Regions:
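Carbohydrate-interacting/catalytic domains
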Residues: 1-168
Length: 168
């Protein structure tokens, strides 16, 4: 943020509304410890909780969706952990499992996109669903091709869903 030094941008209060000072304070500017952020693309009058709540694709709603999925899928919270071999050096692959469900996690930890082939022969014929948005995938086959954006990840539910655990 232009004009803010060190860690000051991290200490700036969250903007709640497009109101004066982001709805955080009605104090006049000289009494504020840090000014509200007005940099293009980050202006508190545009980027604030009130506006973000209304935008389905906002970062706020994306995080809410991710936390909802985690809450609804017990395997992501307390399932067993099994590290899988990754054919791509920048992609971490692992499983989180309970007796009733298996979640496959792929996380690209690099600044470049990653393409890889996954061996799903262990789950051939199982129903497969992308967790965050609930998109059904073709039944698991021996091999899947996956593309992940830079620092991207995906969660797939493999097999049957526990009752009441459908995040879509």
């Amino acid at each position: 943020w232009p004009g803010l030094r060190d860690r000051d941008p991290n200490r700036t209060p969250m903007a709640w509304t497009p109101a004066r000072n982001g709805g955080f304070s009605t104090a006049p500017d000289p009494l504020l410890v840090l000014p509200p952020i007005t940099a293009p693309g980050y202006d508190y009058r545009v980027v604030n909780v009130e506006v973000q709540k209304q935008l389905p694709g906002s970062l706020l709603n994306w995080h809410r969706r991710m936390l909802t999925c985690r809450r609804l899928l017990p395997a992501l919270r307390h399932g067993s952990f099994r590290l899988l071999h990754s054919p791509h050096p920048g992609v971490l692959l692992y499983l989180r499992c309970t007796e009733a469900m298996t979640v496959l996690v792929a996380a690209n930890v690099t600044a470049a996109g990653a393409s890889l082939s996954l061996d799903l022969s262990e789950w051939a014929g199982e129903r497969t669903r992308e967790v965050m948005w609930g998109c059904e995938f073709p039944l698991a086959a021996a091999e899947w091709f996956v593309n992940l954006p830079p620092y991207g990840f995906n969660w797939w539910l493999i097999g049957e869903v526990e009752p009441g655990a459908t995040p879509a």
